[in-house]
Amino acid sequence: MKYSITLLAALMALGIGCSAQAEDCNANQASMNQCASQDLAALDTELNRQYKAQMSWLKDPARKQALKEAQVKWIAFRDADCLYRVGKAEDSGSIWPLLQSQCLAEHTRVRVKELKAYVACREEGCPR
């Protein structure tokens, strides 16, 4: 019983810490960088989920390969575009991780919407 109360107290403290951390995204540069990185990670998880859903729907191996190639090229474009827009880390200072994560997240949000549209489209004329 004592163990359960200790565990409950620890979990509650952890929850409070996470809540406070979520509210501190504008506290300083490091927290802004961290929050932007977490946002990007969540978007990347959703991107991978949608990509896998579409790949599982496709029956034709050539279509699967085409989507795979498109995704690889999209990632290369996204990364190159953000390098162009944000520049190199050594040229930007402590704000660079925030700007880089925001740029990558902006592109990733758009790509997630595109993949969701593919996944939702199950009619004639949709990629199969």
What are these regions (language model features)?
Residues 20-128:
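N-terminal alpha-helical modules
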Residues 15-19:
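N-terminal signal peptide c-region/cleavage motif recognized by signal peptidases
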